[in-house]
Amino acid sequence: MIPPANHHDAPPPAAPRPKSGCLRGRLHWPEQRAIRTIIGFLGIALGAKVVHRVRYERGDHIPATGPAIIVANHLSSTETLAMARLVTGHHRFPHFLAKAEVFTWPLVGRVLRAARQIPVFRGSDRAADSLAAASREIERGHVVCLYPEGHFSSAPDLRPGPGKTGAARLALQHPGVPVIPVGMWGPRPGVKHIWHRHTVRLVVGDPVGLSGVPRTDEADVYRAATELIMSRITELAEQARGARFDAV
């Protein structure tokens, strides 16, 4: 049986952060949150425009309103900005799941917290908090973005690796919410790319249909749904790459 989504209304789990009280005592929480969200949105949108040339196909698969779960392959940290450009370019605001350590980086962490991005505490008893926070954003009608691999591709040809079950769990808890797969391709940033913008290509696919996943053992359901999601992402990544990956 698929466990029900967490309906408790609360902000995303708190990530490690430096102390700051520049807004405390002057504005009430709703006003603070609105200002911080605007700052975060502008920071992410500006970063996305500066770092990459983004080329995308079939972006109209991203729904204009209502919740959505966007899943993609994971090439590098900066490709998240390309994903943000795709989503904001279609007048939606993304809520990414990102490793908690990133929230401690100077400036970057402030922008992520301001934009209500979701920290992931890997290998800890707080790991489930991330999916609960993502579930709350979905219930608010927002767009949640995940990389099911959970880490950068380690394959020589950057083929997407096996996925973790978090995205499938989230999708099966919200059966009416579209799961939008995205395949990304671009050079992995390195020394030779550091001084100029590089092009990232994104191909957006039709929503992944999970209704046909056999409802047997719970763990098997999550694995089957994850494999289906990753197969669609891999197909789209090949389209973005313009060539098939090596057979495995």
Give the location of each predicted region.
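A structural micro-motif
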Residues: 52, 92-94, 115, 142, ...
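Short, flexible loop segments at the rims of nucleotide/cofactor-binding pockets, characterized by
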Residues: 45-51, 120-124, 156-158
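Helix-to-loop junction immediately C-terminal to a conserved catalytic motif
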Residues: 36, 43-74
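Non-catalytic C-terminal accessory region of glycerolipid acyltransferases
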Residues: 2-23, 27, 35, 128-248
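A conditional alpha-helix N-cap/helix-loop micro-motif detector
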Residues: 52, 101, 124-128, 160-161
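Structural motif corresponding to alpha-helix initiation and N-cap regions
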Residues: 56, 105, 128-131
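Alpha-helical membrane-targeting segments
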Residues: 26-53, 104-115, 194-196
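Catalytic core of membrane glycerolipid acyltransferases/transacylases, capturing the structured
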Residues: 22, 64-124
